[in-house]
């Protein structure tokens, strides 16, 4: 699936295309997509394909097309503090974006069939927390991943506000998925080649809406053990954060608010990340043709308008070239600067920065 929008040159360009095509429609979803570079979830040597609107698979590693993830994120109607379950969590790309919207008091769980993919997801999550410039701009609900078949979840597992299944669900498994959902919750999953949004309106009542025609590989059926029974999979616990973790969240929030107030007082607006300029297409000169004997000879049709357009294009190209030559200043991490200026032991400062290296 995919190919609904033009390929981008980088992550921001891809998001611009998804917005223009109305796959991304809300600000929170846009911010999450811009914060997580899709290319970071590709293996080395395959990143050139990261910004195309196409699915990608290598061994057990799989990423759906960007247009699919966009529709899923919009259909889930995510809000801070909700609980989310990703059935077939894969690389963790979607779960990480969801975590940016859920915030620190949400629940973010994923179950994935392949243990090597879970390890890959954990590596990518650790890399995002340690190195991404976006991490300090959000309050994050860190995903927790477990290995297992999502059709073997223990019957006494807790329910969730939002659920997404990233594999084709057969009709006889539809009710199994619905049971995992809280009343008032939203389940998004592919059923019979339709990405479907299901709202649980009551204990035994549901509302369904088809979102998009899709083609997903079906869910892998569970194997029976030596006793002829299925192994059950335990989901991560819904743990309450400890006091130390809560203190870190509120200190970072207070400092972030203080920075925003400082910038407002100075009349400095928060700048959005600079977008790559789209290059203007240069128009061709129009020629007129005259007959000289038996030959058709092209003659340039010079006009003031043609000359003005050519001069404007040249000036813009020269300006873009000169701007490209200017060395870019590295972005300042004001939150980190505030933390490092606090009168605290270095070990506490490191804890407040999540031990990030920049």
UniProtKB/Swiss-Prot annotation:
Domain of life: Eukaryota
GO terms, molecular function: protein-L-isoaspartate (D-aspartate) O-methyltransferase activity; ubiquitin-like ligase-substrate adaptor activity
InterPro entries: PCMT, SAM-dependent_MTases_sf
Acidic residues composition bias: residue spans: 302-318
Signal peptide: none
Region: AdoMet binding motif, residue numbers: 85-94, 160-164, 181-191
Residue spans of biased composition, Basic and acidic residues class: 319-339
Active-site annotation: 64
GO biological process: protein ubiquitination
Chain intervals for the UniProt region annotation (BC-box): 240-250
Topology in membrane: Lipid-anchor
Pfam (any one): PCMT
Residues with lipid group (N-myristoyl glycine): 2
Positions of region (CUL-box): 342-345
Entry keyword set: Cytoplasm, Lipoprotein, Membrane, Myristate
Listed GO CC annotations: Cul5-RING ubiquitin ligase complex; cytoplasm; membrane
Region feature (Disordered): 300-339
Subunit-structure text: Component of the probable ECS(PCMTD1) E3 ubiquitin-protein ligase complex, at least composed of CUL5, ELOB, ELOC, RBX2 and PCMTD1.
Family to which this protein belongs: Belongs to the methyltransferase superfamily. L-isoaspartyl/D-aspartyl protein methyltransferase family.
Function: Substrate recognition component of an ECS (Elongin BC-CUL5-SOCS-box protein) E3 ubiquitin ligase complex which mediates the ubiquitination and subsequent proteasomal degradation of target proteins. Specifically binds to the methyltransferase cofactor S-adenosylmethionine (AdoMet) via the N-terminal AdoMet binding motif, but does not display methyltransferase activity. May provide an alternate maintenance pathway for modified proteins by acting as a damage-specific E3 ubiquitin ligase adaptor protein.
Domain topic, free-text comment: At its N-terminus, contains L-isoaspartate and S-adenosylmethionine (AdoMet) binding motifs. Also contains an extended SOCS box motif, where the Cul-box is separated from the BC-box by ~90 residues, within its C-terminus.
Protein name: Protein-L-isoaspartate O-methyltransferase domain-containing protein 1
Gene symbol of the encoding locus: PCMTD1
